[in-house]
C-alpha cells in the first residue's frame, strides 16, 4: 500500500514525498514487515523522509527509532501519540501530558530524528510544549544518525537480506535455461510447479530467489507479473527479477512488494539507458554484468574497468554503489582454461577497488565437463574466499550446500558451528 501511495505521489507531483508507518512494540508492521525491509523499500523509492507515526507513545517509539537510524540515510520522522489510549468513566484519554510529551520529544531529537510532530491524542498544548522543549535543537546539520549508511539490502514484504557479510545464497532453479520440465511448465502455465520450486529452495536454505520466465512465444511481461505475485503469496524470501525484457522488468518491479534484486544491467550504453531509470523509479539492487559493446573482457583488469563504468553511469541517476552488485562473470574452464583464475582475480579487485558487493552464477564454470558438482562446489568455496557476497547456485545440490556450510563454519559466520551441526550432526 505504501509503495503504491509513494508511486502515485511521485508520478503526479514534483513535491517532496514523506512516508511514515505504524509499527508495533516489536518493531513490526501489522502485515509483518520489519524495520530494515521498510527502510530499504522506501529509500529505494527515493522518498525524501521516512519514519514512524501513531500506534504508541513517544517513549515506546524510541527503540524503533534507534533501529531505523541504523539503516536510514534520509531524514527520519517521528510522530507519536500522546501516550497510550486508556478509558475513564467511559471516555478515552491518552496518558502523556504536554510537558512530559515535550521532554520525550527532546530526547527523540537527541537520538537522531529530524522531523517531529504528534498524532492521536496530541493537542495544541502538546505541540506547544514540544516546540518549547526542543527550541535549542533546531540545527539538524549534525544530527546523530544522519550519516550515509552503506548497506546493500534487498527485501520482501517481511524479510530483509543484507549483502556484504556472511555470503548469501540466490536460488537458481526458477529459470528455464537447461531445464526441460521447467520449460514445459511455463508453456503449460503450470504456476504450481514454479511455486513448488520456490518452496523447495527456501526449505533448502536459499536467502533470495532468482525468477526468470523468459521463453520464445510467451508473453513475458504478463507471466513475470503473475509469477512474482504468486511467489509473494507463498514465500517471504526476496526475489531477484531476472530478465532482458524491459517491459517484463518494469511490470515486475511495479508490483513487487519490497526492494528486489534486478538481474541485470551491463556496460553497454543501451542497457544502462534502459535499466537505470527503472532502478531510480522503483528501487532495487541491480546486478552489473562486466561486459560492454566489446564483449566480455579477457582480463580481470578489463572487467574491473567495465564495473567502474557501470558504477559511474549509475551516479547520474542518483543510484549509489550500495545498490549495485557486480557480476564479473565466469567462463567455463572447458573452453577457457584460465577462466576461473581470471574470474577470481576480477572478483578480488572489484571488491577492493570499489567496495561493492559481488555475485556470480557459479555453475557456469563447469559447463561441458563431467561430474560438474565437484568443480562447481570447489569453485564456489574459492569464490567465497575471494569475496563473493552471493552465489547464484542450486541450493538442492548437496555438494554446493556442503561447501557453503563448511565455509561459513570455518570463517566464523556460523556461530558455534550451529548450522553445520544442524545439517550434518547425524551423519
Language-model regions, residue ranges each:
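Domain-level signal for soluble alpha/beta catalytic cores
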Residues: 1-325, 331-427
Amino acid at each position: 500500500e505504501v509503495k503504491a501511495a509513494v508511486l502515485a505521489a511521485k508520478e503526479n507531483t514534483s513535491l517532496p514525498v514523506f512516508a511514515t508507518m505504524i509499527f508495533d512494540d516489536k518493531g513490526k508492521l501489522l502485515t509483518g514487515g520489519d524495520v530494515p525491509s521498510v527502510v530499504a523499500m522506501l529509500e529505494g523509492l527515493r522518498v525524501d523522509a521516512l519514519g514512524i507515526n501513531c500506534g504508541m507513545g513517544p517513549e515506546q517509539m524510541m527503540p524503533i527509532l534507534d533501529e531505523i537510524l541504523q539503516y536510514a540515510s534520509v531524514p527520519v520522522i517521528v510522530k507519536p501519540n500522546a501516550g497510550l489510549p486508556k478509558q475513564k468513566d467511559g471516555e478515552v484519554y491518552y496518558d502523556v501530558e504536554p510537558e512530559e510529551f515535550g521532554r520525550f520529544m527532546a530526547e527523540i531529537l537527541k537520538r537522531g530524528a529530524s522531523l517531529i510532530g504528534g498524532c492521536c491524542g496530541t493537542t495544541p498544548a502538546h505541540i506547544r510544549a514540544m516546540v518549547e522543549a526542543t527550541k535549542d535543537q533546531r540545527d539538524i546539520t549534525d544530527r546523530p544518525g544522519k550519516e550515509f549508511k552503506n548497506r546493500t539490502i534487498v527485501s520482501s514484504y517481511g524479510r530483509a537480506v543484507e549483502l556484504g557479510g556472511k555470503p548469501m545464497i540466490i536460488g537458481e532453479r526458477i529459470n528455464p535455461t537447461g531445464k526441460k520440465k521447467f520449460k514445459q511448465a511455463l508453456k503449460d502455465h503450470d504456476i504450481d510447479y514454479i511455486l513448488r520450486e520456490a518452496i523447495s529452495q527456501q526449505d533448502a536454505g536459499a536467502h533470495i530467489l532468482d525468477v526468470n520466465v523468459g521463453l520464445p512465444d510467451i508473453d513475458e511481461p504478463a507471466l513475470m507479473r503473475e509469477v512474482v505475485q504468486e511467489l509473494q503469496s507463498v514465500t517471504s524470501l526476496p526475489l531477484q527479477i531476472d530478465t532482458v525484457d524491459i517491459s517484463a522488468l518494469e511490470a515486475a518491479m511495479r508490483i513487487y512488494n519490497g526492494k528486489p534484486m534486478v538481474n541485470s544491467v551491463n556496460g553497454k550504453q543501451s542497457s544502462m539507458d534502459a535499466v537505470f531509470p527503472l532502478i531510480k523509479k522503483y528501487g532495487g539492487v541491480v546486478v552489473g554484468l562486466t561486459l560492454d559493446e566489446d564483449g566480455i573482457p579477457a582480463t580481470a583488469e578489463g572487467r574491473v574497468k567495465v564495473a567502474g563504468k557501470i558504477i559511474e553511469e549509475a551516479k547520474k541517476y542518483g543510484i549509489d554503489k550500495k545498490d549495485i552488485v557486480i557480476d564479473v562473470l565466469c567462463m567455463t574452464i572447458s573452453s577457457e582454461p584460465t577462466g576461473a583464475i581470471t574470474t577470481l582475480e576480477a572478483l578480488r579487485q572489484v571488491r577492493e577497488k570499489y567496495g561493492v558487493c559481488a555475485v556470480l552464477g557459479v555453475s557456469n564454470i563447469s559447463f561441458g565437463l563431467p561430474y560438474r558438482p565437484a568443480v562447481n562446489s570447489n569453485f564456489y568455496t574459492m569464490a567465497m574466499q575471494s569475496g563473493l557476497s552471493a552465489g547464484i547456485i542450486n541450493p538442492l545440490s548437496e555438494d554446493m550446500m556442503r561447501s557453503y556450510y563448511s565455509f561459513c563454519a570455518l570463517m566464523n559466520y556460523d556461530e558455534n558451528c550451529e548450522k553445520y551441526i544442524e545439517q550434518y550432526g547425524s551423519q
